[in-house]
Structure formats: structure tokens, C-alpha cells
Amino acid sequence: MINNRICILGTGAWATALGSRLSLNGNTVFLWGIDNNEVNDINSGYNKKYFGNTKFSSSLSATTDLKTAIGDSKYIIFAIPSTALDSVLDKVKEFLSDKKSQVILINVVKGIDAETSQILSNKIKSKLGSHYYSRLVTLCGPSFATEVFEEKPTVINGTGKNLKIVKQVCELFNSDVFKVIPINDIVGLQVFSSLKNLLAIAVGLSQAEYTSVNTMSAILTMGIEEIQKIACKMKAKKWTIMSFCGIGDIFLTCSSTQSRNYSFGQDLLKKGVEKTIKENKKTVEGFEVYKTAKNIITKYNINAPIFSSIIEVLEGKLDPKEFSKKCLELFWNQKINK
């Protein structure tokens, strides 16, 4: 097993879980963060903010100095909130000029750019150039960070422009409990990974009122159809919906209270929009992406009533208590499938 030097940008749950997996695979892992307390915690063998008093199974190092973190790393992983990607790309760019022939970039940030409605791999391309885009691999799939950290069996997908590099990254992560499977759909993987979070908010909201698997299944069915419409308009491949990054990730995010987006949706009914946003301390990707989803639906003139309704809730235009009632009306108006 080759010992690679790997830099992970981020010290959150996902960054730490992936760092632990890569370290267990025999690599030397450095995490970069801006929170001194988290950095010190990681250097002492813990990330108590996300994993309590569970000690790392292998050694991780962390620093607030970006130059030190990147060092002579062969791989650089972006594992930060999507809202921080712009500023972090600008910082990282300064340290990449002498690494054009070897460094491989890995993106695990989820989202679609709010201003341009472009997938994040294209944002990385616009910031760092075509050379690094050709050496970029994006990972996504059904994976709660806590379960990856606990070494529960997990399967996700990886995609990128260069299939050889994609396979290389897959092998970097693969173990007897963690598997990355290559997929040839850069757009689809990222669109599904983003929009499923907004659907999870819708499902969580409905479950707070009905606590019904029947209702959840109905909303999921219609919501998945809407995601597929949006993805195809953005040039995703139709079959990607049946992959781990498609239906697998949608099911995970829309069916468990471990999902921040699902829990956020439940809180919308219990506490209202304003209070839920104010009290929420963790990143909720679905809330971050709703404006982007609205722009895409409008741009392509897509009929997406479930998405349009949850967007109205998040904009304060529809009372959360009226959301499920509106969904019921949509169910009753469904026509026979041809």
C-alpha cells in the first residue's frame, strides 16, 4: 500500500471521516481549518464537535496554516461548505503553480453555484483552469459522515474528465468497508447531490405533519421525477438516477433524521421558517440551494410543483402548515401514467 501525502481542506464531520478512512488506508493526512479549537482537538486524536469522545482509529494532523497543510501533497481534497468554496479556491490557487504535473484535486463539496447555476466542478475549472479540471474528481453518494467514521459499509460514486485519474482516486479510498465506483456523468452526479437536499426538506416537512411512510413515498416519487426533469435539462445522463449518487443518495437524505436537511424540514413545521434558520447551527445544503433551484426551474420552464412549493415555504410565501395540504392536492390531480 502506497503512503500518499493528502491535504484535506476542512475540519468538519465529512473532512474528518474521509481523513480517518484515508489514514487507515496507510496515507499521511493533513487537515486544514480556520477553527483553532477544532484543529487542536484533531491533533489530540478527537473531533468532539462531531464525533464526541470517540478517538480516531488512526493518526490525523491538522493546522490553520494552508501552506503547511498543502505542502507536497499528491492529493488535495475540498471538504468545506459550498459557501466557502470561492474564497478557498482563491487561497489554494497561490500554492498550485509548481504542481501542475502531479497534484490531483478531489471535490466532496455539494451544491450548485447560486449566482451562475453552474455545477461546482465548473466553478473549480473557472478558478483554477483547464489543467486542474482535467485532474479533478468529484465524489458523491449515500454516506453519512458518522457511519463512514464508524467504518460501516458504504458505497459512493466518483466522476471526472479523466477516467484513469477517477479510477486512481477510487483505489485511494477503497477498502473492505468503503467503496468508490466510477461513473461517467459529471453533471448528473453533482445535480442529484445538490437537489436531493431540497427534496429532503420537503419530505421532512411532510413527515412532521403525517409521520406516514405512505405520504413520504408519494412525495419522494413526485420529487424524484422533478429532479430527473431538471437534471436532464442540464444535460445529465438519464441512467444516472439509478446509481448510488442518484436514488441511493436521495433515499438516504430523505429518510433519516441523521440528515440535516430532513431534520430542517421537520423543524419548519414545528418552529416556523425564521426560527428554524436562526437556530440552525449546521450547514443545511437544501436551504443554500433553493434559490439556485428556483432559477433553474424558471430558466428551463420546468413543471416542478413539489420543488416550487417547498421553495415558496423557504421564501416565506407559503405557510409550512399548508405545504402538505398542497402536496395532497398534487397527488389527487395525478394523471394516469402512459
UniProtKB/Swiss-Prot annotation:
UniProt key word Hydrolase: no
Binding positions for sn-glycerol 3-phosphate per the UniProt entry: K110, G141, S143, K196, D249, S259, R260, N261
Reactions this protein catalyses: sn-glycerol 3-phosphate + NAD(+) = dihydroxyacetone phosphate + NADH + H(+); sn-glycerol 3-phosphate + NADP(+) = dihydroxyacetone phosphate + NADPH + H(+)
Predominant place of localization: cytoplasm
UniProt keywords, alphabetically: Cytoplasm, Lipid biosynthesis, Lipid metabolism, NAD, NADP, Nucleotide-binding, Oxidoreductase, Phospholipid biosynthesis, Phospholipid metabolism
Lipid biosynthesis is among the record's keywords: yes
PROSITE patterns cross-referenced by the UniProt entry: NAD_G3PDH (PS00957)
GO cellular component annotations of the record: cytosol
Binding site for NADPH: W14, Y50, K110, A145, R260, E285
Subcellular location as annotated: Cytoplasm
Described purpose of this protein according to its UniProt entry: Catalyzes the reduction of the glycolytic intermediate dihydroxyacetone phosphate (DHAP) to sn-glycerol 3-phosphate (G3P), the key precursor for phospholipid synthesis.
Name used for this protein in its record: Glycerol-3-phosphate dehydrogenase [NAD(P)+]
Organism annotation: Malacoplasma penetrans (strain HF-2) (Mycoplasma penetrans)
Species classification: Bacteria, Bacillati, Mycoplasmatota, Mycoplasmoidales, Mycoplasmoidaceae
